[in-house]
């Protein structure tokens, strides 16, 4: 599927000069509220959430090719970003209904691809929970939903970034060794599926295909994959799509995420960048709540800067240009 000139131009705004997407993710809503609630007894306010996003945007977007924000709390942060930093806006509601089976997708009801574009977005991002082993009844609804969003983005001539998070309802802990064993197939098969032209996806935002905490040499305890098995899963992932794809940081530490990117590259994965969130900014949450705005800025200018600068250094030697796809 060839991209329109408008879509190509928009993705260029989200990338650096080398064609690498070095994007900062701060579209967290539910997860951010939970992180903030760990450090204060009262419920986080809208003002607190918006201000923290603004701080991160003001301090770190000069080092990122683009930033992913949500239109619920992130619009002030989008205005505060560096002039050279592109903008992705999230289209999904945060989280999913834990009382209903299937983790069905849901758009923010007051937004559309048209409205996100009018808000200044260079791309629309949508998060989908997907299990290739779920029932056809569940998965056909998800496929149809993604087809709708893809068609919307084609109509508006705006790039569609699809984020896929895998799960298994029979394995409640997705950080367990049990899930680590099934993760490679679930991640790679979902990528293969949503690379089909009918979905009109332009860039995939994906998990790495293994849990690095269970890889030989990375693991402190149980080993699920040898280094060679893990490397093969990365190669299989690369072969699963013809689309540009970028990795999400999944809340791991900055150091582990950087080591993961090196491992992916050494395995032969031709990934095209990252959308890195908590691995870059999570430490600022506690500082912001306990010590205030100025202390949070100082954290972002030192530790936050080091996290993103180290990541950019790693990307220079590991990621490849999406224009090669």
Curated annotation (Swiss-Prot):
Domain of life, source organism: Bacteria
Gene Ontology MF, one: 6-deoxy-6-sulfofructose-1-phosphate aldolase activity
Known EC number: 4.1.2.40
Keyword Cytoplasm among record annotations: no
Pfam families: DeoC (PF01791)
Gene Ontology BP annotations: 6-sulfoquinovose(1-) catabolic process; D-tagatose 6-phosphate catabolic process; lactose catabolic process via tagatose-6-phosphate
Involved pathway(s): Carbohydrate metabolism; D-tagatose 6-phosphate degradation; D-glyceraldehyde 3-phosphate and glycerone phosphate from D-tagatose 6-phosphate: step 2/2
Family: Belongs to the aldolase LacD family.
Protein name: Tagatose 1,6-diphosphate aldolase
Source organism of the structure: Staphylococcus epidermidis (strain ATCC 35984 / DSM 28319 / BCRC 17069 / CCUG 31568 / BM 3577 / RP62A)
Gene designation: lacD
């Amino acid at each position: 599927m060839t991209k329109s000139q408008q879509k190509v131009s928009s993705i260029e705004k989200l990338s650096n000069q080398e064609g690498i997407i070095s994007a900062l993710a701060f579209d967290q809503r539910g997860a951010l509220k939970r992180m903030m609630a760990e450090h204060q007894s009262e419920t986080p306010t809208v003002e607190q959430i918006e201000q923290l996003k603004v701080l991160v945007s003001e301090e770190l977007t000069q080092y990122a090719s683009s930033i992913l924000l949500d239109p619920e709390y992130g619009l002030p942060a989008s205005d505060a970003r560096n002039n050279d930093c592109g903008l992705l806006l999230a289209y999904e509601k945060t989280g999913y209904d834990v009382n209903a089976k299937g983790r069905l997708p849901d758009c923010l009801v007051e937004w559309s691809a048209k409205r996100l574009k009018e808000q200044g977005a260079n791309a629309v991002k949508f998060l989908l929970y997907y299990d290739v082993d779920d029932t056809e009844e569940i998965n056909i609804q998800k496929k149809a939903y993604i087809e709708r969003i893809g068609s919307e983005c084609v109509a508006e001539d705006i790039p569609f970034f699809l984020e896929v998070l895998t799960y298994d309802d029979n394995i409640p802990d997705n950080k367990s060794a049990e899930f680590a064993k099934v993760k490679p197939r679930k991640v790679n098969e979902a990528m293969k599926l949503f690379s089909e032209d009918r979905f009109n996806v332009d860039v995939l935002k994906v998990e790495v295909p293994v849990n690095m905490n269970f890889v030989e040499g990375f693991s402190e305890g149980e080993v699920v994959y040898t280094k060679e098995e893990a490397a093969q899963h990365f190669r299989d992932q690369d072969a699963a799509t013809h689309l540009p794809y970028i990795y999400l940081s999944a809340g791991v530490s900055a150091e582990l995420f950087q080591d993961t990117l090196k491992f992916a590259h050494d395995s032969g994965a031709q990934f095209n960048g990252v959308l890195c969130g908590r691995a870059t900014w999570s430490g600022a949450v506690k500082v912001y709540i306990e010590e205030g705005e100025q202390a949070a800025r100082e954290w972002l200018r030192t530790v936050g800067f080091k996290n993103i600068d180290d990541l950019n250094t790693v990307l220079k030697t590991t990621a490849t240009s999406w224009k090669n796809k």
